[in-house]
């Protein structure tokens, strides 16, 4: 085991206690062999880099600042560790994901609450054009188009616990169209193919299943719930999900049939568009007509102020993607907080309405969102110190997970 920085130097700024340092060092020692490249052990650099990330002030993290905080390592050592060294970040990620899965399973054994795999995207504002996959695109962190990197994340959650277990960097189309730029950033040729965020989410889900990560259901926001390519694939794989949908999503309260209407009269062209024999409703219009006695008040989680309650309504509906010959049956879950200006959430599930109780569907719909907010807080604390290469980006994220 390579000598790590002394505890006195690490703890002098008061960020960590002696006990925390001992536990952190013991934890990272488990990954010792994964940082060995051609007989060179990078564990000291990994340890120092992790400490540098934790010690530097948010939004002021770069390799120069990290060297100031942990002077045992030089700038070029950090740069080489992230961008040049051939340690396998994927192998480290897989180890942490499996350890997280085992921990969440033990939490489930105690609480009885199901484990969710939450898919969500997050943006990280950047300056300049050199960072890998940076572009002017929508940045959720500030609610507008800005210069940023965007990534899709997978998190495991169970009741009060959540942790990030996977990520994939979104590469904009303008980057894919510029092979020279992709090659310069060391993006593998196999990855120089444009993927939408829902496609990236599906890849994360499948890779974690293949790895052996255990979960009971899949959650995500409206970007994923609205994407029928993703939901049809989850149906095909028989993976249970509860995904948010937008308020303008169209639903049928009865199973519709679809056909091209017969031509009426002799004038004009014949109809070519398929139409349903039932009326479709926007979800928010349906919500406005729910009677008071059609809501269930359920207890969902304990807070510092006591138990949190929400109103829940579930109903079987049909949703059509505009392409298939038939509509697919979904359970629509609507939750409403008990406030002067209530917050309303809509979700679709491929589970039958009889498969789960109203309270269980409320858990999937509401509790998971609270944990997503915690996960979002974790992601906003990630720092990206001027990384130009794709392996460096993933290596940086990997050290955050440790």
Outline where the language-model segments fall.
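Conserved, well-structured functional cores that handle cations and Mg-NTP chemistry
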Residues: 2-218, 225-250, 257-259, 264-281, ...
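Intrinsically disordered or highly flexible coil/loop and linker segments, enriched in small
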Residues: 59, 63, 214, 370-375, ...
